[in-house]
């Protein structure tokens, strides 16, 4: 079932490393303190993959749990909440992640994991949810425009990285988010949220055998033949020292 298994021991933490049938690298650390499981899937799908549609990765990830072909956002939220599970997504300039935290008892874990797998394989991005999330995102961007720390951070990255994909804020710009279509989102999901673009980390009180079974289910849900990985963008960045000043009105 598993292509390779190695063990790494450091500071009393034992980490098992192996690959699923379709080649996803999995790291597992056993923790017997609490009967829980933490699953984190990391993708090479940060905002550096946005291309001309700035904010695309973050918008896509924020919509993953807003609907599948058979469930609406309310039902998805209810499944996680009623089983005490937490679903979360995160996007930075380099990477994105999709995670699940659940109790390990079967009556809680099974429905939570089933919902998690459905999101990975079948997010549908309903038009009404896309439009609503775009409005929320634009409101956040507008609010950030009056936040000195956000302004300073955006200026810093723009000055340092120029036209490199790292230069724009991961959330995007109001005008760019406004132009993002459902098709843009679906295409990004299909091209980037896939088995060849993923790695999995799991911390749990479950046995290695049980974790392997879960990893294989995740791997299978991400294995969609039509998905493809985009070649990593690389660009030389010249090192330079600059001081960036921005005046703020105290009124």
Residue ranges of predicted features:
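M16 family metallopeptidases and their MPP-like homologs
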Residues: 27-29, 34-59, 73-120, 150-175, ...
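Boundary at the C-terminal end of the N-terminal hydrophobic targeting segment
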Residues: 9-13
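Short acidic/His-enriched helical or mixed secondary-structure segments at domain edges of catalytic enzymes
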Residues: 136-154, 234-251
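Acidic/histidine-enriched alpha-helical segments
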Residues: 77-78, 123-142, 207, 226-240
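Scaffold signal of the M16-like zinc-metallopeptidase fold and its non-catalytic homologs
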Residues: 66, 144-195, 215, 248
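An aromatic/glycine/proline-enriched structural segment found at the starts
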Residues: 162, 167-170, 175, 199-251
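Solvent-exposed, polar/charged alpha-helical surfaces in well-ordered, non-transmembrane soluble domains
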Residues: 62, 74, 78, 110-114, ...
């Amino acid at each position: 079932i598993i292509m390779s298994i190695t063990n790494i021991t450091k500071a009393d933490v034992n980490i098992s490393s192996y690959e699923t049938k379709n080649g996803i690298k999995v790291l597992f650390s056993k923790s017997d303190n609490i009967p829980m499981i933490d699953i984190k899937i990391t993708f090479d799908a940060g905002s550096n993959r946005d291309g001309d549609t700035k904010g695309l990765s973050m918008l896509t990830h924020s919509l993953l749990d807003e609907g599948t072909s058979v469930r609406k956002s309310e039902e998805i939220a209810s499944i996680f909440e009623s089983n005490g599970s937490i679903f979360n997504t995160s996007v930075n300039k380099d990477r994105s992640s999709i995670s699940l935290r659940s109790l390990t008892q079967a009556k809680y874990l099974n429905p939570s994991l089933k919902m998690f797998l459905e999101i990975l394989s079948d997010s549908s991005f309903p038009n009404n949810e896309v439009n609503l999330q775009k409005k929320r995102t634009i409101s956040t961007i507008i609010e950030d425009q009056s936040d000195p720390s956000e302004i300073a951070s955006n200026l810093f990255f723009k000055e340092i990285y120029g036209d490199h994909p790292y230069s724009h804020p991961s959330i995007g710009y109001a005008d760019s988010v406004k132009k993002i279509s459902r098709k843009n989102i679906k295409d990004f999901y299909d091209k980037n949220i896939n088995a060849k673009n993923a790695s999995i980390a799991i911390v749990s009180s479950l046995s290695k055998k049980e974790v392997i079974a879960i990893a294989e289910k995740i791997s299978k849900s991400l294995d969609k033949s039509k998905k493809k990985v985009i070649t990593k963008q690389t660009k030389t960045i010249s090192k330079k020292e600059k001081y960036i000043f921005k005046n703020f009105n105290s009124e």
